[in-house]
């Protein structure tokens, strides 16, 4: 498959466009998503440059924010089907190590990505992949700021 691969931390030149990168294989609780759209955000730049205290495994495929279609299911995946349109929540909450898709595991700057089923968000038919790919980190940042800085409480309107 084609992928934008970071082989070492550095400037923009450290990203290599690979045309024969191995296709991902799903673990039992994962799906393979054919990426329909991906966007870049500040965290992708941090992943490329390197971040103090976070060891990013190399080579790395960045891309936290992406959306696409499920094309393969791991054997334990329930409630999802081939052809389902999904957006990805990049925060890995189900593992003690945590981390992000596109940081500690391959992300969406590739044709295909293995994604834990817990990180899938059903995408309505009237929302484009491009629009959905703009949401995860930007939305998560805005939501967190509403709670932490704005101290918005349940029932309040913004």
Where are these regions (language model features)?
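Residues that mark the start of a beta-strand
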Residues: 2, 30-32, 157
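Short polar catalytic/cofactor-binding loops
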Residues: 7-11, 38-40
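Short gly/ser/thr-rich secondary-structure transition/capping motifs
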Residues: 12-18, 51-52, 140-144
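A short, acidic/glycine-rich surface segment
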Residues: 14-17, 53-56, 96-102
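Glycine-rich beta-strand-centered segment in the early N-terminal region that forms part
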Residues: 22-39, 51-92, 124-127
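Cytochrome P450 core scaffold surrounding the K-helix E-X-X-R motif
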Residues: 43-49
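NAD(P)H dinucleotide-binding glycine-rich loop of Rossmann-like/cofactor-binding domains
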Residues: 89-158
